[in-house]
Amino acid sequence: MNALGHMVGDAEVVGLGEATHGSRDFFRMKHRVLRYLVEQKGFRAFSLELPWSSGVRVNEYVLYGKGDLDRIAREEFQGSYRIWNNQDYLDLIEWMRAYNRHHPADPVHFAGNDMGYAGPELYRRVTDHVSRTHPHLRSRVTTLYDGLAPTTDAATYLERYLELPLTEREKRAERTRKVLELLQSRRPAPGTSRQEHLWTVQHARAIHQMAKGYSYDITDEARITEMMKYRDRVMAENVAWWHKHTGDRILLSAHNTHVSYDAFDPRYPKTQGAFLRDSLGGNYVSIGFSFHSGAFKAFGTDDNVMRTYRVNAAKPGSNEHTLDRARQRDYLLDVRTAPHAVRTWLAEPRPTWNIGAGWPDPMEYRIALGKAHDILIHLNEVEATTYLGSP
């Protein structure tokens, strides 16, 4: 870990990827990295590829022990996010809770940064704040939010939301935008801290991010690409917002595709990592994972059922085939300071494992690892995480 700490240096935000969304070895390494960065480098936030509102609930548990973690995971980790309901992530969250019990004056926080869902918790926080601090706006805000907050489980809510006509989804985004702009135009009420006001505005922003994200025409491939770019921009903005308003150094956890600089996937024209580099410059560092062979959890692209999949040894000509020929089975590589011959090799795109939430994936991803990340962690073999959610 000390070698990784030296590579990270003074970076304020570290993006730590994963080559699959369901391998325990990536998650356990993230746990190790988080512990090291918290205990040795002063990091105080872990930000996951998870909706902002879900992060709010998990953070309440991490800080105060509020609620039951198993129940929170069942209720918040749904739909495409259900892969996070695994033993390795719950272990990581429990470590954060244990750390905070021993360091109540200097806690570590959990944050979501994605836009895929806005739970009832956010609507309550915004409307309660308005009722207390700007009671003359209460009727306006409750009217604009009327019928928008989820009243079912998250998966059902999202399924039904995407079945709404495009015009209705566009109208909902317009309503959430008006609430956001209404709050942005107000100063903190007397007796209200600036921080409380800013957090409420951010919660309203997260509600609008979801509504706007789902206001794109999902039957149009070009608009889907625009939505994916919007999603990565939002994820970057939420991380940058947390850093700006808390001062926390942050470990960001997401797929390699998101934390990278290079948009090697045509569906993601600009990545979260590229947006963070624009806003933070050298204060953002990207770490990617690679692996030679192994297993992972994913949901079937045909039936949406979660199961274990396995891939055999990486093919000759792939990035992993060559990376696995090093003397060490598992190792770190600082791409920025590698010998010239290595950097030249890393600058060329080659087939690479890039496994998301669903499998199989017919696409072949050609990635120039040296353009995608600052640091690589290569693992010879990985195994599937222990999934705790519904199939």
Model region roles, listed by residue range:
Residues M1-P391:
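Structured catalytic-domain cores with a bias toward divalent-metal coordination
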